[in-house]
């Protein structure tokens, strides 16, 4: 699994979503399932082969990256 940041194409300073997925196609699938419109957004690989504290691969997910 890999870690991805998702942000607007014209504003790379603000990450909108964070995803754990095997590839960008899975990020797109997760976004669709979550009702996230990816039009105008960019996916960027943050880190490859991410694992939890015990060294196990993380499960696929997408979450809001903004802190309110």
Language-model segments: what does each one mean?
Residues 1-14:
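Short aromatic-glycine-(Arg/Gly/Cys) micro-motifs in beta-strand/loop hairpins
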Residues 33-68:
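Short, mixed-charge low-complexity intrinsically disordered segments
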């Amino acid at each position: 699994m890999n870690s991805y940041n998702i942000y607007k194409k014209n504003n790379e300073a603000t990450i909108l979503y964070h995803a754990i997925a095997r590839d960008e196609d899975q990020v797109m699938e997760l976004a669709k399932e979550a009702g996230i419109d990816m039009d105008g957004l960019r996916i960027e690989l943050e880190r490859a082969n991410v694992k939890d504290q015990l060294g196990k691969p993380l499960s696929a997910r997408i979450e809001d990256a903004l802190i309110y």
